[in-house]
Amino acid sequence: MDGAVRLDWTGLDLTGHEIHDGVPIASRVQVMVSFPLFKDQHIIMSSKESPSRKSSTIGQSTRNGSCQADTQKGQLPPVGEKPKPVKENPMKKLKEMSQRPLPTQHGDGTYPTEKKLTGIGEDLKHIRGYDVKTLLAMVKSKLKGEKLKDDKTMLMERVMQLVARLPTESKKRAELTDSLINELWESLDHPPLNYLGPEHSYRTPDGSYNHPFNPQLGAAGSRYARSVIPTVTPPGALPDPGLIFDSIMGRTPNSYRKHPNNVSSILWYWATIIIHDIFWTDPRDINTNKSSSYLDLAPLYGNSQEMQDSIRTFKDGRMKPDCYADKRLAGMPPGVSVLLIMFNRFHNHVAENLALINEGGRFNKPSDLLEGEAREAAWKKYDNDLFQVARLVTSGLYINITLVDYVRNIVNLNRVDTTWTLDPRQDAGAHVGTADGAERGTGNAVSAEFNLCYRWHSCISEKDSKFVEAQFQNIFGKPASEVRPDEMWKGFAKMEQNTPADPGQRTFGGFKRGPDGKFDDDDLVRCISEAVEDVAGAFGARNVPQAMKVVETMGIIQGRKWNVAGLNEFRKHFHLKPYSTFEDINSDPGVAEALRRLYDHPDNVELYPGLVAEEDKQPMVPGVGIAPTYTISRVVLSDAVCLVRGDRFYTTDFTPRNLTNWGYKEVDYDLSVNHGCVFYKLFIRAFPNHFKQNSVYAHYPMVVPSENKRILEALGRADLFDFEAPKYIPPRVNITSYGGAEYILETQEKYKVTWHEGLGFLMGEGGLKFMLSGDDPLHAQQRKCMAAQLYKDGWTEAVKAFYAGMMEELLVSKSYFLGNNKHRHVDIIRDVGNMVHVHFASQVFGLPLKTAKNPTGVFTEQEMYGILAAIFTTIFFDLDPSKSFPLRTKTREVCQKLAKLVEANVKLINKIPWSRGMFVGKPAKDEPLSIYGKTMIKGLKAHGLSDYDIAWSHVVPTSGAMVPNQAQVFAQAVDYYLSPAGMHYIPEIHMVALQPSTPETDALLLGYAMEGIRLAGTFGSYREAAVDDVVKEDNGRQVPVKAGDRVFVSFVDAARDPKHFPDPEVVNPRRPAKKYIHYGVGPHACLGRDASQIAITEMFRCLFRRRNVRRVPGPQGELKKVPRPGGFYVYMREDWGGLFPFPVTMRVMWDDE
């Protein structure tokens, strides 16, 4: 009976439960339900039935043996199968029981219980056909070594089915259950190593709580660890430390050896920072390390709360300008201090941008409604959150430079074309599809032995040796060679007392601070540049400066007090062959003989003197870069791995969630740029007005420039870099008034365009011929030629029809319903505004765009926009020097790929008259621009241009100049009208957009669009002064300009000039069109202005004729932008991991019932 519910039972079950109103209470009966959906099938709703009852179940045997039902579609949940009756022989059971012996084993008179597990034979009786498939799937997964499992196969559930069917006493059942439990257990850490809350999110000043369950492991103030247990009995009388230095360590006037690989002093300055980061022996107790055992950039941030507080401003997360916490570094060569100041500036850059971006509201400023202690506490938290996250980010750059730039030089990877690097943070395990690797984030404790391993004084250059000698003379009043160990500590203590407690008041290198607390950039750049040019010393015996004698003798004494193992014991611990002869230690006869006289037997050689006196390795490409002594080259790599892999802030907690997406990307390395090297980020961010974006001094400072030139020439990369010493680059001259802008842009003989450099870099000779590349007659002729092809008869109607049709097509195809299906949503920038111009340029210029209608294209819509936006940015908007090099190198690669494809297409069209080109499908008959691209190419050819010139001097640069700019103005105008300042104009725009297109309505819509652009646009243009001049601004200010100055004309203030725009904050769609300056004026005014205005008119019409256009709720509806000086903005990328010069994403919605 369709639609009826039928209950069926067979009376009382064997338990004799009572029946009320025909329904048994708690009886084991079968209840069957019939629904039309299930036809003649029945579903078992209760668990058990009489053995004689037969029934079917839905979904109890699917193709993989699972019991499933789709409860979302009206089906009832599945149930299990009816168990098979167990056949037993009562007489056999009775006989077994009667023959049992009396239970005498236990005192309580019970029989012992014996658990006897069944074997495979019994298991096979319970296995079904699909269980065999499950077993095979398990074996296959094991053999393939699958780490990530496809849970759509339901393998885990199928195993559960199999195990559930096996007998209770089955051995395989127990084994499979154990295996399942182990896998589930191992999916999580035990105990967990990562916890929530600021106390676990930020580094503590002293390094404690790096390991949550051993919080003092590696904290400042901890004891040194011991790496190797000393077992060899040392001689009763050891040689005098001073004699050891004179015999095998000290440098003589004729024995100095410069570094064989021409490594610069910068590498050793970096090593100095690392060494002082993790080692600070307490002079009152040499067993105690006053530093933490982590590379937490303590020389900058300090090892205690007091030290950290001394460098903070306690405002907006910033540090005091140009300072660092650790006084010890002030006594080092001044280049070390310059590196720390560069990190100081980077920290403040990070703190500023974290606040501006404010990812996820993480750094919201406290409410003005708070008062008293609550207000004070809120601002304190705001400052501390910014400071601590900025520290994590800055330390991230520190460790990336260490693991990529520094380590690549250590093992000579900088001389080969490889992206491999020894990054101890490399993840391993199931989630990355590899075997499990070494543990991460387990903490660290540095040892006394490694304190001795990191004393690389042989590598001090001649220049820095003189500095050390002068420092000793200044501190002790006598030459370093005359200073005794007992005087050493007293002298350093006195120096520390004389050093200002406030890091912001300290000086170094004879440099002076300015009124703003900063050092002069010219001084710092000169200092660090000279260090880049300074070849360091070589590792090995008899190369330590004489000025370091007292330091080295104290090191030998300290090693003896620590009772560290000898050189051979140390080597054996690291599985290195012990030395059997002194000639094995060093083949130099003089050094070997001195060691023999000092120690008698190689086993007696002490660790520290042995490490210094060992023979140094010769450079190997790759493999040996800094050419250390043999033992050092092995053990420092082990220590580097432990230092980094044990630090949770560089492993398990080094994530975008902790550093923010932007912070993580800001310091991340890209193996496709400089093979991952990121030192340039620190240099150029600290000194943007001195280091060019491609300065070899900034990119590869750990090798001297002359050697870098040899390396880069051999790798075929020398053309990417500038090898000149850095020098001051004057900042741009800013012109902000309407009249000043007109004057600069119209006076071509005095102010020249600056775009030739970017165009030439991207497109070579072809780019230099582009109409915007210069001010010569050639460029003016190129402009006329392109204008003649763009603006042919009927172009207005064709452009208008195209944008009207394409805008509607994209709004329909890219939008979607969410929620109650009454509102359509779309990303108006990413999926519509940017794309419509991509389609226009592709049709007009024959670009290889891949679409559903044109599947033979090469680049998708988003890829094409990305390429064209990168081209525009490189040529016209390359404003951030620290981001310029990766931008330019990556853009050139994709730009040339595009240009070569375009050139091939141009050749085909010009060679075969009837060809539509390589990338164009058959056009629709009503397609407005169906033959525009082909006609343009042939027209340019008719003007005498070569196929190369058409592609490289016209098509590609024109497309790059047009698409992102036009997309930008639409996005900014729409954003304005969706903002509180402009949203009350939307009803007026909507009414105009609903009316038929006429000259009047078109002009009115264009007026609204132009007003939105005027009020929200961020436009400007660069020129270079050819002569000295004085520019008179509208407010009477006179701006002096020197020949060679870069002049930036800002349209932001000019667009609000009340002289030209009365009531400038009010939208007036009827203002004279010629007043709008953002398309430029003069000889280089935007050639596509007329087409652009037709385009934005139709785009406004198409969008705003929709009802109730508005932002979607939440941050997806906002155009995320970050303010820059002069009223400009940059925009967050979609993942908020970086900044972009053009709007990226903003979602809107409208009513569509």
UniProtKB/Swiss-Prot annotation:
Pfam families: An_peroxidase, p450. It catalyses: (9Z)-octadecenoate + O2 = (8R)-hydroperoxy-(9Z)-octadecenoate; (9Z)-octadecenoate + O2 = 10-hydroperoxy-(8E)-octadecenoate; (9Z,12Z)-octadecadienoate + O2 = (8E,10R,12Z)-10-hydroperoxyoctadeca-8,12-dienoate; (9Z,12Z,15Z)-octadecatrienoate + O2 = (10R)-hydroperoxy-(8E,12Z,15Z)-octadecatrienoate. Residues 81-98 have a biased composition (Basic and acidic residues). Residues 177-525 are annotated as: Fatty acid alpha-dioxygenase. Keywords: Dioxygenase, Heme, Iron, Metal-binding, Oxidoreductase, Peroxidase. Homotetramer. In the N-terminal section; belongs to the peroxidase family. In the C-terminal section; belongs to the cytochrome P450 family. Bifunctional dioxygenase (DOX)-epoxy alcohol synthase (EAS) that converts linoleic acid (18:2n-6) sequentially to 10(R)-hydroperoxy-8(E),12(Z)-octadecadienoic acid (10R-HPODE) and 10R-HPODE further to 12 S(13R)-epoxy-10(R)-hydroxy-8(E)-octadecenoic acid as the end product. The epoxy alcohol is formed from 10R-HPODE, likely by heterolytic cleavage of the dioxygen bond and subsequent intramolecular epoxidation of the 12(Z) double bond. This is Bifunctional dioxygenase (DOX)-epoxy alcohol synthase (EAS).
